[in-house]
Amino acid sequence: MATIDFYFSTLSPYTYLAGNRLEQLAAAHDAQITYKPFDIQALFPRTGGTAPKDRHPARQEYRLIEMERQAKKLDLPINLKPAHWPTNAAPSSYAIIAAQNAGGGDLGTLVQSILRACWAEEKDIAEDAVIRECLTAAGFDASLADSGLLAGAETYGQNLEDAVSAGVFGAPFY
């Protein structure tokens, strides 16, 4: 069975806009997805990138135009300037890592619900209640938000190192 390494950030609007197309592609080709959330804010300086807030105003403006265009094309609701962005991506990423390790639910649905919470629902994905709600909606035990924090932190850090080694420079990256 083929495996797809999916590097992403729960803060990334482009990961949100990718929707569930990866999961559809994997299902159509009998491939397995390894979800690898990483710290995109730490990735940018290590790979020659610039965080959105530090980009030239013309680039910032065009980014919003392109995000709106893509959201319309994909028929996805989007708030171009979410109230809780950027926020701490670590808690939601740790929950995804814990859910992947635990199994039993729908990981793609979990990832999409966290991204949707940030980019369409004005929720703070660093908040425990939001993470628990997303876990439950995807068929996972909400207590995963609390368990595996140490393992989640270790894996989250390793995912960043793996991303740099693999030539990842943004999110999503496959």
Question: Language-model features: where?
Answer:
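C-terminal cap of thioredoxin/glutaredoxin-like
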Residues: I4, T10-A31, N101-G104, T109, ...
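Structural alpha/beta surface segment adjacent to cysteine/selenocysteine redox centers
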Residues: T10, L17-C118
